[in-house]
Amino acid sequence: MQLTLNLSGSAGMQLLLLVSSLLLWENVSSKPTAMVPTEDLYTRLAELLHNTFILAADVYREFDLDFFDKTWITDRTLPLCHTASIHTPENREEVHETKTEDLLKAMINVSISWKEPLKHLVSALTALPGASESMGKKAADIKGRNLVILEGLQTIYNRSQANIEENENFDYPAWSGLEELQSPNEDTHLFAVYNLCRCIKRDIHKIDSYIKVLRCRVVFQNEC
């Protein structure tokens, strides 16, 4: 998978360094020793996801503080996140009962499903009057990190499959919120931005929780 990152300045450099470091998890030469052990991938992903959740929570919190207004949420029902159709365990017991491969596949589906909406969230926050520069930069950081997270999850998943099909398809839902996000109606636009901030925070937290369980299961044989 080729990553394309369109960032500039210090934030862009930090992200490029992050990607350069984390992409070492896959073989960079023909030598088997160049492949980072799966156990290390889990550790790196766990740290990356934890930090990404902090960023997502910051973006949500800042948007909520600066833009939340009863005028654009009154008489509106919070919609389901576009990833709601992806079957994921809902509690700790279900997580522990789910096979490693199935949990990884669900996490990959969630990550893939955010590639497109994150692009538009970055654009929306960057262009939003009154939004801080840091909020847009954090959203761009989340967007780049999601690509790295996806790369890592796919690497681990591929290694876990003895007879994996080439170019295996993943069943992820399409995002259909662009019209609302680009609406000329300010209330509709802000409500759409709010829901993206809310849902990315929710989904990153979910994947973060799952990777911790899998790391405990795979690396420490559930002794943690």
Swiss-Prot record:
Pfam families: Hormone_1. It comes from the Eukaryota. GO terms for molecular function: hormone activity. Its main location: secreted. It is found in: Secreted. Disulfide bonds join C81-C199, C216-C224. InterPro entries: 4_helix_cytokine-like_core, Somatotropin/Prolactin, Somatotropin_CS. The keyword Membrane does not apply. SUPFAM superfamilies: 4-helical cytokines. Residues 1-29 form the signal peptide. Keywords: Disulfide bond, Glycoprotein, Hormone, Secreted, Signal. Glycans are attached at N109, N158. One of its GO terms (cellular component) is extracellular space. Belongs to the somatotropin/prolactin family. This is Prolactin-3D1. The gene is Prl3d1.
